[in-house]
Amino acid sequence: MTITTQTDARKLRARLKHPIIDADGHWAEFAPDMRAEFRRIGGDTAVEALDMASARIPNSLRMSVAERRRRRIGQEAFWFLPTKNTLDRATAMMPRLLYERLDDLGLDFCVIYPTAGLGYYRLPPEKHRRALCRAYNVFTAEQFRPYGDRIIPAAIIPMYSPEEAIEELEFASKQLGLRVVMMGSLIRRPIPALVEDHPEAAKFVEWYDPIAIDSEHDYEPVWQKLRELRIAPSFHNGARSILLRNSPSNFCYNHIGHFASASEAMAKAIFLGGVTRRYPELNFAFLEGGAGWACSLYADLIGHWEKRKLDALENTKPANLDRTGLLALAEKYAKPEVVDAIRRGEGLDDNGDGTGGVEDLDDYSRCKIASKKDFEDLYVKRFYFGCEADDPINAWAFNRKANPMGARLNAFFSSDIGHFDVPDMTEVVPEAYELVEHGLLDDDDFRDFMFTNAVRFWGEVNPDFFKGTVVEKQAAEVLAKPR
């Protein structure tokens, strides 16, 4: 097989004055090797856990459409890894080949996330979940350790409880030397009322815990541990085959928008839960969902604050209704039946005078918003958004005219190499550059998208993150400059 080295990606990279960091590539873990290594690392428990986690999608695909419809099980991805492009398939499987091809792909540095392991943090039995994540983290660290100057893998952090998260953070950071983490979130939990009143049904209906707001667990120690370890958390959660993305016959129906949906839930919880207010030392990344949802959420959070902050609630407070004035208007403009109802005080408090038992009426109280400027500090500066190369909506993040207060959101390049939506790994960097060629980004925007924002995401939290890498000097120059 001939390996082409004079790729368009290599040529484009040679013209640029800055490195390129891929903030979210994927490798395709080779199951037979992984199984053998898991047994060595974690024994029978790790292998049992691997078998449990690996069975879900194949079991679903073995069902007929009719059976999935009967059970309301979503259609999963079939044929999701490269096959026709054999070189890319091998590149996704073999870390050394990826390392050797980075220049051909136009990449200086790459952060690698799981494929099979993306959902390992969800495995329900605690014993197996923790063994599975531990074995995976050891396995991945060993696989990529020789290539650390250009490739860093992400550790999987289970989050069903703060205790298991802290233990794995400590191990991954201090024992394995990993400095990228993929945090579990949208944790499936039983509904207490069903457990108490209908225990036979409780296992079939769950709620999704975004951990940063209204959780039954206190995750404050997790944020504290991330700050202590100087680790910027990333979230690569999906919402496929649940709720409104649960077609039993159409994978694309389930797949489109599911990363954005999950990311929005997490970002909204972290913001409204006040995490960015309490931990300004941390940055947070939401991967593979693009930036369109992030721009929309940013504007919507501001819009809701303007209408629902405490002083704005005076506009809808039931006690502020001038009933005498309303009656006078009704007597002039309404039919007699309406006048009589208003005179009796009927129909004027659609929801009564209740507030649902909420003592603090300010939904933004945890993040202590005093002015619109706070949204820049707590949202714009703290959140980062992984965007694939072929998404033209990436340009929205950099559009100061479209975003409130002239904001540029922190979109960064996330290639998704190794998955079905990248048929040729050598094309992702040129594809990203099309935003410049089409006039949607300028050169400064492209530099920030492909390099600067990734440096700031990890480097602001851990200034030593890029030490020993091929981009150490350029990253240090970025971090030495004020925003």
Give the residues covered by each predicted segment.
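Catalytic pocket-lining loop regions of alpha/beta-barrel enzymes
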Residues: I3, A131, F144-I152, I157, ...
